[in-house]
Amino acid sequence: MSVTPAERRPIVSADDFDLSDYDFWARPMHEREHAFQLLRGLERPAFYREPEIDFAPPGPGYYALVRHADILEASRNPEVFCSGDGGATNIPDMPPEFTEYFGSMINMDDPRHARLRRIVSRAFTPKMIKQFEADVDAAAVRIVDDLLAKGSGCDFVTEVAAKLPLKIICDMMGIPEKDYGFVFDRSNVILGGFDPEYGGSDVSSIAERLLMAGLELNQLVQDLGAHRTEHPTSDLTSSLVNANIDGERLTAQELGSFFILLVVAGNETTRNAISYGLRLLTQNPDQRALWLSDIDGHAPGAVEEIVRLASPVNYMRRKVTRDHEMNGTLYRKGEKVVLYYWAANRDEAVFTDPLRFDILRTEGPHVGFGGPGPHFCLGAHLARREITVMFRELLRRVPGIEGHRPERLYSSFINGIKHMECVF
């Protein structure tokens, strides 16, 4: 049961909030920032009960890793902090059909993870991404053309931020334009399952809605894959269904799971980074002016700073495979830890004045694309390119554009903006 802002307990100490309570994630951002600052100041990571979900068994609880150093070490040691035992994208252990369907490689360890990543990674190398540069550039131009035609006051998220990654991912896979809206709607359901706008008011049917959205996306790519097997083109689906690396290729189930991962991760996270980017520029006119003074020269630093503060994915979960001491804390075999990237990207031990948006910042690295190691975001190069091009086009043609009244996604997993009015 949700509570009103007036009923929420003020955050004075680490005992005043619960990361497993969905209402914590609906608090204002400054309260969330203060809460994680308190957690980073504790002698050892805080331990929490697990969220209660009807379709998952009750769990033993988890440690919240909120310091940059802890998240880097856990990410670099997948043999100790594994992803495949119950899944990485949810804190409770998920049924196998969920981890296979909605996480694909994210919810796997080696050797399965290495095999799948080896097959699909060829499409996401810097060399391959360079082949899409002209498409990204042209799409951004058309999006700003449409924005100017619609005029001030439209929804920046749906009219700008969501359009670019959706088009690029669908084009890469060979999904026809008539299905863009279908893909967009289903990905919203998968990542916004608890948000009332996407049907989340009926908690009892969340699992059914998630599975149905996954089944529909899976069927879309299975039909396309079957056609591309007989009639291959230059798109990514053709490459995946016909890929043969050391005698291996994707199974039909693996193709479906990877597609779901791609459209969800590739669309939702990049669109939220772009949305937060405009909000940050609106709140920090000095940084807008600085970026405008050298749009191309300041773009790399600005994009990294946007991703750091946006932190589109709040967390991933790991399970400890053997007793292990990390930075003074002993973790026992079978215990769960949750890697809060959002918190690590605001760690005072790494980032000077961490809440400040500073496009010249040099400290890091941030973990907005996940921590270092085998699960680092496969599409990071593409995401950086999309964010760079979108803001280059906006700053050149609509330099005074602002984002106001953002509506946040009701989610503990995704740090998302659903809607935001743009004014220019």
Regions found by a protein language model. Name each.
Residues 1-424:
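Cytochrome P450
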